[in-house]
C-alpha cells in the first residue's frame, strides 16, 4: 500500500493527513491515483476537517470531553468520481510542534492525525457506459460535476443545501428559456402563416382579374379566400362576404318614371305611388307573368272607375268602359302644376262628373248600353228622358215671357 503524507491548514492549526492508496490488480499498481484525484480528495474532506477543528476549540474552552466521532470503529465513508474514501481521526501519543517562522508564528499542529484510505471502484462495462452517457449529457447541457450523483454522499448538509438551491436556480432558468423559445417559434409560425394567407389571397385576386373565368368560378375562389382568412384571423364569414361581395348590375335597363307620371298612375288606380312601383314587374319575371299582372292592374283600375262613376251618378247602374276611357283622358290632360295637388284633382274630377253635359253624355251612353243588353228597359228609359227634355223646353219659353213682361 502506497502512502503519502501532507498537511491541510485550517485556521491556526495544521492537520496532518496520512493518505493510503490501495493498489489495483496483483502488480500493486497505484498509477491510477493522479494529482487531480488528490486535489479532489482534499476538497471532499475539507469541510469535515474544519468541523473537527471547531469542535476541538469549543471542547477546550468549555473543559468538557470530546465526542467520539469518525474513529477507526466508526469511520467516514465517501464516494468520489471513480474511487472510494474511508477516513477517521486517530489520537497521536507524541505532541508535535511546528517550526515557527515569521510567516507562521501562531501555527500549531493539530493533536489528531487524519488517516485516509483511497480505493478504486470496480467498474463493469455497463456501469462505465452509463456513466459515460451521463457525463456526456451533463457536458451537453452545461451541468458541472458538482451536481453528479456520485458526489451526493460526500457532501455535508450545508453543501447539500447549497447544491439544492443551485439546482432549483438551474431548473428555473431552463424553464424560462424553453418557454421563450416556444413562444418565439409560435410567433414565427403565425407570421409565416399570415404572410402565406395574404399572398395566396392576392394571387387569387390577380388571377381572377386577369383570367376570363365564369362568375361561378370567381365566386368559388372568393369563398376559398374568405375561408382561409377566417381560419387565420377568426373573423366571421358574413362580414368578409359583405366586404368582398360586389353589387349586382342593374340588367333591367328600365328608368324610373317621372314623379308626375307616378302621381297620374296613382290617381287613376286610386292607390299610393309606392304600390304602383311595387307592382312593376321584376326584371327576372317572364313576359307571360308580366302580362298577367298588367291585366290584373287594368281590371282593378276599371273597377275603381266603375265605382266612382256610380257614386257620381247617385245610382248603382253599370257604367260602360267608354266612360272610363273619357275620364282617364280628362285626368291626363291636366297640367303638371295641378298634378302636384291630389285634393284639387279629386275635386275637379267630382265637379266634372256632376256637370249637366256629362250627365247627358252618361245618359246617352247608358241608353245605348241598355239597348244592347235589354231593349224593353231601354225604351222606357228613353221615353222618360224625352219627357224630361220636353218639359224643360216648354218651361224655358214661359220663364222668358215672364221676364219680358216684367221688364215692360
From Swiss-Prot:
Region named Disordered: 173-226, 243-313, 365-408
Residues modified as Phosphothreonine: 392
Phosphoserine: residues bearing it: 130, 213
Ranges of compositional bias, category Basic residues: 398-408
Keyword field: Isopeptide bond, Phosphoprotein, Ubl conjugation
Domain of life: Eukaryota
Keyword Amino-acid biosynthesis part of the UniProt annotation: no
Cross-link (Glycyl lysine isopeptide (Lys-Gly) (interchain with G-Cter in SUMO2)): 61, 79, 167, 176, 239, 242, 256, 291, 347, 356, 372, 399
Bias kind Polar residues: ranges: 208-219, 243-255, 374-397
Entry keyword annotation includes DNA-binding: no
Subunit: Interacts with SLX4/BTBD12; subunit of different structure-specific endonucleases.
Protein name per the record: Protein SLX4IP
Organism: Homo sapiens
Recorded name of the encoding gene: SLX4IP
